[in-house]
Amino acid sequence: LHKEYRRQRQMCIRDRLYTKNSRMKDPEYINIGDIQLIEQRQNFHVRIDPPGGDLGDYIPFYFGGHSPMLLNIKTGYRGIRKRPQDELIYIVCRIKDIVAQCPAWCFTDGHAKNKLTEFYNDIKDLTHVDWEVVCTQFWGNDEANMDRMRRKQAEFLVKDCVPVSCVAGIIVKTADREAYVKTILSRLSIEIPIYVDSKNNYFYP
């Protein structure tokens, strides 16, 4: 899963998802979340080769919803600019489609910048992802699991770009936002299923 700010939707859906560093990126690209962390990631080395490079060379996907960063965006915690969740969408891709269409990718078992995190480049190693944690809404560390928050933020990283043919669906928070996205897709003559997260399976209540 990958979050996009709404002003970025039309360009990324029409063409491809590009990294922040790409010369093909949307000129109106807007960073959301922790700007300092985003900048730190640009030159943070990916600890597996292939595919190698830095995190700034990759498009990051979460495996599930309710990320810690989304909560920070919702609440404005840690000085992060507060935004309504309705301004965000999830762009959903299937791993099998990315593997088939994107030549360079890897994934982690936790937050990519954490020293404890391992990187993998073999689909067989998806067993190292803590699927119970990445799919839960409640991810805080406690005495029972002091590593839950790191594991919650496991990432699938795709190098350079992701073609729109990999987009299996779009998740929005409200019916109003569904109508807005439908208008964009219709204008671009693109058919992508849209799902309203009425039960808060991905967005926070």
Predicted regions span which residues?
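Residue-level signal for well-ordered alpha-helical segments
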Residues: 11, 38-48, 144-149, 158
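Conserved NAD+-utilizing ADP-ribose enzyme module
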Residues: 15, 54-57, 69-205
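Glycine-rich loop/turn
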Residues: 14-60, 65-83
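Short hydrophobic-aromatic micro-motifs
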Residues: 6-7, 61-63, 91
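Short, flexible, glycine/charge-rich loop motifs used to bind or transfer phosphoryl groups or to couple energy/partner
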Residues: 1-2, 49-50, 160
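Single conserved hydrophobic/aromatic residue that forms the stacking wall/gate
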Residues: 1-13
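Surface-exposed loop/turn and secondary-structure junction residues enriched for glycine/proline
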Residues: 4, 20, 33, 38, ...
